Regions:
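Feature marking well-ordered beta-strand scaffolds used for ligand recognition
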Residues: 1-179
Length: 179
């Protein structure tokens, strides 16, 4: 798009599913957030260092262990939290998932998934690395779910929950109650 009146296709890549949101990680990397072929939320890291031959370098599907999943970050970019760092970036994605579990229909689970993008200075080595998840009250993930990151601190605000914890131990995030 260097000449907006004459856009050109310099390269292309066919991938299963689609991306609703593309986020620039670096000049050579793009992060896609969208839907997989199974219609589950997915994060996909694209290496565009060679624009004529972009590649999908890393893929994570959220809620893949159950029958359905969705993320409000697919339609509301403010639901995605992204903290850029020199070597490693951090991001969080809220999502809900559910289905048949042990023959019982249909429990649902609401979560915040935490990821790091590592190796971003060397695009060929960059990866999306799962860090952990914060469990929320079922039915609490919606378009207003937010995460605030401050160094190692982690704060989650949803329709029902207000939690705090640490990036290094997200599973231990606990409810914050006023005194």
């Amino acid at each position: 798009l260097s000449t907006p009146s004459r856009p050109e296709i310099l390269g292309e890549l066919e991938v299963p599913g689609f991306s609703d949101l593309l986020h620039e990680v670096s000049d050579a990397l793009l992060l896609g957030l969208g839907s997989s072929e199974r219609r589950h939320p997915k994060l996909e890291l694209y290496n565009i260092s060679d624009v004529a031959s972009p590649i999908s370098q890393s893929l994570v599907e959220l809620g893949s262990e159950l029958d359905w999943a969705y993320s409000p970050a697919q339609y509301n970019r403010y639901a995605l939290t992204y903290l850029s760092g020199d070597d490693t970036d951090r991001l969080t994605v809220p999502y809900a998932t559910g289905g048949v579990v042990d023959g019982i229909c249909c429990p649902s689970f609401d979560r915040i998934a935490l990821f790091e993008i590592t190796g971003k200075r060397t695009p060929a080595e960059a990866q999306i690395v799962p860090v952990g998840e914060v469990s929320l009250t079922p039915g609490s993930v919606d378009g207003d779910t937010r995460v605030v990151l401050d160094s190692d601190a982690l704060y989650v605000i949803s329709r029902v929950d207000f939690l705090s914890g640490f990036w290094s131990n997200p599973e231990a995030a606990a409810s914050v109650t006023p005194d």
